[in-house]
Amino acid sequence: LYALHAADGRTLLQVLVSIAESFLAGTPTGIAVDPESCLVFSPSHFTWMDTNYPACTPREGYPIELAVLFAELLRQLARLGVTRSGEPYAVLAQRVVASLALFYRADLGFFADTLHCVAGTPASAAVADDHLRPNQLLAISLGVITDDRARSALSAVERHLLVPGGLRSLAPIGVRYPLPLVGSHGQLLNDPLHPYYGSYVGDEDTRRKPAYHNGTAWGFWLPSYAEALLRTYPKDAFARTAARAVLGSCARALGEGCLGQLPEVMDGDAPHHERGCDAQAWSVTEHLRVWLMLGR
């Protein structure tokens, strides 16, 4: 697989090495790796939560999913025996994994979504928020975190984010780290201490953009929850049954609307009306991937 060629003639392995080294060196767009923690710094609205004008989930600082995916990239390069002139990829990966401790909120039982700071600030000096989002699931589903923290975080996700067919992008609970959303005319669009939006309806800039990643449920995250169940309880037969049941909650959607497809998003509040595009590749391919995994 890694010998396959990308569009520019490089192998996929060469592309992966290029990504890792570009992050470590810093990119012209402001992405950088903190030398101390090896966590990835992201400028405002650079992640998949990228709504802008207004920026409704800016997440400037160290987002948790970037840390996990970077750790997995480094571990994969180490497993493939790729060498470099500086610190080995395996050592860098270990530093990222150790630094995930900066995200864990023992007082809340789940991982902070982002360590907030401006560019040039080390992760150790950033502020961990208390925003419960599904991004932390990657740490569990990819096997980066396997201890009691995984079980606690998974439980929090189940209590506050899980809905039929998807996971809420933000828990419907108050926060202490404020998330103010400011409109194009400088007006405050939300209650910064209660930033959850339960429905994805209304005007695009003042209602739908703020709701898009702040409560709206996303279908592509549901399989990650099922996968995390299996990772966390690998010897529990009930976990596999529960994972199948979770994915099975999408059966109705497959038989309605755009037949054989799954929607992009749905309202975070019941009855969880389907929203966004009728056929979302993220949703379909992730469900298929994990369903096939459950069958093995």
Where are these regions (language model features)?
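Inter-helical turn/loop segments and adjacent helix faces that build the functional surface
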Residues: A3-T11, L74-A90, T232-A237
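C-terminal substrate/ligand-recognition segments
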Residues: P180-K235, A239, L288-M293
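Generic alpha-helical structural element
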Residues: H5-D8, R59, T146, N214, ...
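Beta-strand segments within the central parallel beta-sheet cores of soluble alpha/beta enzyme folds
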Residues: L13-V17, A90-R95, S155-A156, T241-A245
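Catalytic cores of carbohydrate-active enzymes
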Residues: L24, P28-P35, V68-H185, C250-V284
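Aromatic-rich carbohydrate-recognition surfaces in CAZymes
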Residues: L1-S44, T51, P63-A71, D129, ...
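C-terminal hydrophobic structural anchor segments
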Residues: L229-E256
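Acidic/His metal-coordination segments adjacent to aromatic residues that form catalytic metal sites
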Residues: F41-Y62, D113, C117-A125, Y200-A211, ...
